[in-house]
């Protein structure tokens, strides 16, 4: 286990907190406003893809020094990162299956609304959706949720870092849902295994590379299953 975890700087973490809690929610409205202002009409799917790309570019720009530090450090621990990614990917699969069985027992007709949303986008733009969900989204979300939020709390309280980063990660994926509160609760529960395993992979590998690899693998399984 590496002695030092590569975290974003204090300024990067501050931006990450603000952007994860506010910017991510406001960006779709900002994009829509800009497109309307210049006379461009986008479908819902096109707007979502634009959202993924702009989100990624903003995070890359702000966290550019963090990416440089991560790139330098990962060369010394690449095998350990891959090992941790493989280990926690396996743990995620086990936990996810267990939670899935519980959800099926509680509500046999449950379906993940976020998955249906991505499937609808992929139905019209499969390759762009694959690129965004497998590559851009994992790098963006890991920078924000593990790098900024988990990293911002880690030195103060490790348990809080795990709990808060996992809860916010889950909420971001369901905050647009409306309807049956029980279904929303089950949707929230579905993201807990991923949040915990991604945080643990970052903690024990010492590099954001490990959770990014896991996140990419999970999303790849989901998007390839749509083919």
What do these predicted regions represent?
Residues 2-23, 65-97, 101, 154-160:
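Interfacial transmembrane-helix boundary/kink motif in multi-pass membrane proteins
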Residues 13-21, 44, 48, 52, ...:
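Residue-level signature of transmembrane alpha-helical entry/exit and packing/kink sites
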Residues 17-65, 112-120, 128:
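Alpha-helical transmembrane segments in multi-pass membrane proteins
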Residues 26-50, 101-106, 177-183, 220, ...:
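Juxtamembrane/transmembrane-helix boundary motifs at the membrane-water interface
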Residues 40-41, 68-137:
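Juxtamembrane helix-loop-helix connectors linking adjacent transmembrane helices
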Residues 60-70, 201-204:
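Structural signal for the C-terminal ends of transmembrane alpha-helices
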Residues 124-227:
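Transmembrane helix-loop-helix hairpins at the membrane interface
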